[in-house]
Each structure stands twice: as C-alpha cells, then as structure tokens.
C-alpha cells in the first residue's frame, strides 16, 4: 500500500476528532481526591522546575538585609501559613487534599536558588494554587519574602513568633486589629534597617488616606493588600485615629557626613538640579495634614519609599503626584543622605499630631 498525504491527513484528523470526543465525553477524571498518575506527577514537576530554572536565568539577586525579614514574615503569617503551615502552627488538614498539596517549605526551600524562589513568589505557579504576588510592580517586597524564606528552615516556633509579631488573641474587635497592626508596626519592633513605617506621630488624615489608597490600589503593596483586605472603610478610619493618637518618642540627633548632606537637602534642596527642600512641606508647624511626617522613620523604609517615588511606583493619597515630581531628580546618594537625616532627626522638632 502506498501511503499518500491524504492518508496522513486522515489519520491526523481522526486523532484530533478522537481526542475531542474523549475530552467532550467527560471520561477524563479531574478529581483531586484520586491524585495524579505517578508519571503525570513526574512530568508536571519536571516541566515546572525546568520552566522556573530557565526563567530565572539572568535574574540579579539583591543583597538581603535583616530589615527585610519582619515585613516578609508578617506577610507569610497572614497570607502563606494558611496553606503551608508554619513553625508556630501546622497547616490545616483541609489543604492536604489540594492537588498538588501545598508543601512543607522547610524541606523544599533548599532545592531552589534565590532567583528561582523570586520567580515563584513574584509570578506564582499555574495549576498548583500558588498565587502570584498580590501586586505586580513591587519586586522589592517579593525579594524581601525570598530573604525570609532563606531564613525560614532554621526557625523554631518561638523564633518565628518573634519575627512575625504573631499574636493569638480571642477578641474579634478593634483590639484584634490593633494587635495585628502592632505585630509589624509597634515602635519596639522597628530598627533603622526596618522596611516598616512608624505609625505613631502621623496625622489621622495622612494615615486614613494611606489606608484608603491601599484599599483602592492607588498605593500598591502586596503586604498591605493582604493586611487590610477584609477591613471596612470604617475600620480603616478607626485604625488611623487610634495610631495617630499614639505619641512618638524623641530620637537622638546623630552627626556625620551623610547626616549633614541630608540636612542640607532637607533644609535647602538643590536648586541647580531642581530638587526642592523637603522641610518646605514636611515636618513643620501647620503643615498639610495629608503630608507624612518623616522624622524618626526607619532609614531603610524612607530610602525604599523614595526609590519607589523615583521609579514612579509609589502611589498614595491626593498629593502623590506632588511627591513624584519632587523626588524625580534624586540620585542614590541623595536618597541615602535624606534617609539618614530624617531617621535621626529629633521628632520633637516637628509639629504635634493632628
């Protein structure tokens, strides 16, 4: 028999039609309860690992700092532990019936490189239930999570609770919400290297506008998106009022070249480069209550926020465009100097909370 093109085409059409009929018939089971065939499981994991490995090629890994850990740990407790469990609490039995089931990360993290972990955290994994980071343009937060995951396998329950600010309380009211916020934002948890802002000393206007901006996604943060996703606007306002009423402890003034450079920029700006003076708007008597108070904030937090403004990723309340323009000409050394200055600036120099 001579095989002609029409025979080949006929076989292909028959195969396609057969595949369609099998799929349409519903004979292929999609039950999670029965699991995958072993070969299916092997192929799916092979494809996933190969894809992540290739996508991670050329990814530049930033330096990790201790300041990354508390923010990422708090997010892990709020958004990840419900599936993966944690050193403080085992994962719920219900998620064990997912297909594939979320793994215990203590044993899995060591099998991935930093770049590969970033790809998984930032983009998620299809067909596994592993979501992408809640917002697409906050790679800095995803890298903080990678820094935390690197530390995760060595944490015991007490170390995990200390890092996350984990608090288990019975109340379901405002006390619970305040305790949850303080798990990250409590003043005694903040250090110069913290990426978490100090809330005490801010105006209720600024805090309310910031929280509503997070809720409306005009200020984008995967960490805050998860933290406030279940809160009503009334609860956001109550939280803003509460934290605005907390006093801010004075901070000692520090000397040094970086501090002095930051002080000059804050007081005078740099007119030759179009950089305005920060203190013409911030931290002065009768300042616009929508402007945040900068004195006493962790240096790492301030530097990160300024970088986000420079990169046009920051967002925020009604005056976000003002700050985007003000920060546009800042260079890396300017950001470091301003962060050092305002972090060390005496809070007593600024106006009392509204």
Show where each model-derived region lies.
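C-terminal functional regions that serve as terminal interaction/effector modules
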Residues: 236, 276-285, 290-354
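Short, solvent-exposed interaction modules
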Residues: 178-183, 256-283, 287, 291
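Periplasmic c-type cytochrome electron-transfer domains
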Residues: 2-86, 92-95, 108-123, 128-183, ...
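Short, non-ligating residues that shape and space the ligands of small metal-coordination modules
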Residues: 89, 190-191, 287-288
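N-terminal targeting leaders
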Residues: 162-165, 258-259, 305
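Cys/His-rich metal-chelating microdomains
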Residues: 86-87, 187-188, 284
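Short cysteine/histidine-rich zinc-coordinating motifs and their immediately flanking basic loops
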Residues: 92-98, 193-198, 290-296
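Extended intrinsically disordered, low-complexity coil regions enriched in Ser, Thr, Gly, Ala
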Residues: 93, 99, 203-225, 254, ...
